[in-house]
């Protein structure tokens, strides 16, 4: 006899045991091979799962219970340590399979570069997609110290893939001058410093569209999420990010997938970062799936 795995801390709380009957699939991407400052986000997915044990299954934000959403936690991918290219290929292939099985991908990072292969996989099925990007950093570099495969490049790659006019960034407060100039010149949407208010203004314009949402935990002020590789002072509160997640849930956009990245537990002995992240994942499941 085995005790209920859904309450073991090895999977996200209340994860179903049946992949076939699930609508969404949670999967971890434990990669921090290109991190330029502080590594450890490869340990993020499992710490988020463990922190989920402290959650209530009911959300007063969504007025829903996790028993109402069929999701399966596939665990962490076995990515080759130190090999970004092969790791990204594996992530893209896995998301291809999820989409072929008509599952909604919910990815846990890991550094933000892991979002890039997901964008590519999603674009094959949803060529008209838009991306909502919530982050402290612009991530619009073409390369970092000569390396195009970097955690500082995924949104620039997304602009090349789907067109900058289909990329909407919120909460941005850090980047090179050239990144901010690119955003201004290219036609992409960038809201600096804030998330909830500008997002609510943009969502009606995205009504009816297929939207992928990528959230970097460092959009939060370090007071709320110190456990991240590149913390940036001057961020938003946990309350504002919850408000943004709820706003997306109550909008007319069609969320086709999502990820939450850059939880680096080594820098947060209090565990407030994975605790917050687990709550965000709960709201994403209840509001977007």
Swiss-Prot record:
Entry's Gene Ontology BP terms: putrescine biosynthetic process from arginine, via agmatine; spermidine biosynthetic process
Residue pairs linked by disulfide bridges in the UniProt entry: none
Keyword line: Hydrolase, Manganese, Metal-binding, Polyamine biosynthesis, Putrescine biosynthesis, Spermidine biosynthesis
Matches recorded under Gene3D superfamilies: Ureohydrolase domain
Reactions it catalyzes: agmatine + H2O = urea + putrescine
Keyword Manganese: yes
Family classification: Belongs to the arginase family. Agmatinase subfamily.
Annotated protein name in UniProt: Agmatinase
Name of the gene encoding the protein in the UniProt record: speB
